[in-house]
Curated annotation (Swiss-Prot):
The gene is asnA. It is found in: Cytoplasm. PROSITE patterns: AA_TRNA_LIGASE_II. InterPro entries: aa-tRNA-synth_II, aa-tRNA-synth_II/BPL/LPL, AsnA. This is Aspartate--ammonia ligase. The lineage of its organism: Bacteria, Bacillati, Bacillota, Bacilli, Bacillales. GO terms for biological process: L-asparagine biosynthetic process. Belongs to the class-II aminoacyl-tRNA synthetase family. AsnA subfamily. One of its GO terms (molecular function) is aspartate-ammonia ligase activity. It comes from Bacillus cereus (strain G9842). It is an enzyme of class 6 (ligase). It catalyses: L-aspartate + NH4(+) + ATP = L-asparagine + AMP + diphosphate + H(+). The keyword Membrane does not apply. NCBIfam families: asnA. GO terms for cellular component: cytosol.
């Protein structure tokens, strides 16, 4: 039966250790400045992240003006807008401590309706919009993960070390070709188990089979220049996503992707106009799950062991039977 390596109190202390170390190194190595993040945005701005395009944001109206607002799903679009508004230049970037509510999340060991992540974004030049630049950025972030594991091992040697020296890169099409008989999720399990750490490139567009590896909104990532960082989780014995990131759409890729998804109505939103008219800067960015990080590096079996959220009674009871104590 599962046995946590730390008490609840010890876990809370270690969570701070994980978050403080990672935040400090992320800012230094990617040259990012921390900024304040919104909890909600106006509906008409188009700044909310609509994820896979089907999740419903929490909406409410403001007493003062009656304007419709939405609780953010993530800050994927807001960050790009903020870089423009704050006057950042190529090579400069920002990050935020993002908190969100995703009401339509399907709850399980790795998913909660409460989302906390380091949301970051950086301005790039046109010639940097390449797979090579994407991979170099992934390697920088992976280096932070490696150093975090070493740092924790010095304080908590019983946590062990599992990450390989290097992260492996593979495209979603190469992954389908390698495991044509498997579902996309099972492909992720297979490749993560084989290598320990992998970055899957190119998520959102249809593969040669006609199926997508996974869904992605049409208006933030360029589907050819994005991907997910996956580790093999030693406790769950499955693939485990730590980050979704990518080079963002330019006017050409946004135009193509909105057409593919049948979302031409979004062309009238301020954010989308800013990209189509080349007003907003070209960027790269992503979200790095804070609870996901804590869950992996503290070797936890459930995300509820590292964050406070609301869980159905039947799920709490099932966890208790498995010796999993939720916050």
């Amino acid at each position: 039966m599962y046995q946590s390596l730390m008490t609840v109190r010890e876990t809370q202390i270690a969570i701070k250790e994980v978050k403080t170390f990672f935040e400090d190194q992320l800012a230094k190595r990617l040259e990012l400045f921390r900024v304040s993040a919104p909890l909600f945005v106006t509906k008409k701005s188009g700044l909310n992240d609509h994820l896979n395009g089907v999740e419903r944001p929490i909406e409410f109206d403001m007493l003062h003006s009656g304007e419709e607002l939405e609780i953010v799903h993530s800050l994927a679009k807001w960050k790009r807008f903020a870089l423009h508004e704050y006057g950042y230049e190529a090579g400069e970037g920002l990050y935020t401590n993002m908190n969100a509510i995703r009401r339509d999340e399907e709850l399980d060991a790795t998913h909660s309706i409460y989302v906390d992540q380091w949301d970051w974004e950086k301005i790039v030049q046109k010639e940097w919009r390449t797979v090579d630049y994407l991979q170099k950025t992934v390697q920088t972030i992976y280096g932070i993960f490696k150093d975090l594991e070493d740092h924790l091992f010095e304080k908590y040697p019983f946590l062990g070390k599992y990450l390989p020296e290097e992260i492996v890169f593979i495209t979603s099409q190469e992954l389908e070709d390698k495991y044509p008989e498997l579902t996309p999720k099972d492909r992720e399990h297979a490749i993560a188990k084989e290598h320990g750490a992998v970055f899957i490139i190119g998520i959102g567009d249809a593969l040669r089979s006609g199926e997508k590896h996974d869904g992605r909104a049409a208006d933030y990532d360029d589907w050819k220049l994005n991907g997910d960082i996956l580790f093999w989780h030693p406790v769950l014995q499955s693939s485990f996503e730590l980050s979704s990131m990518g080079i963002r759409v330019d006017s050409k890729s946004l135009d193509e992707q909105l057409t593919k998804t049948g979302e031409d109505f979004k062309r009238e939103y301020d954010f989308h106009k800013g990209i189509l008219e080349d007003v907003l800067p070209l960027t790269i960015g992503g979200g790095i799950g804070q609870s996901r990080m804590c869950m992996y590096f503290l070797r936890k079996a459930h995300i509820g062991e590292v964050q406070s959220s609301v869980w159905p009674d039947d799920l709490r009871a099932a966890c208790k039977k498995e010796n999993i104590h939720l916050f």
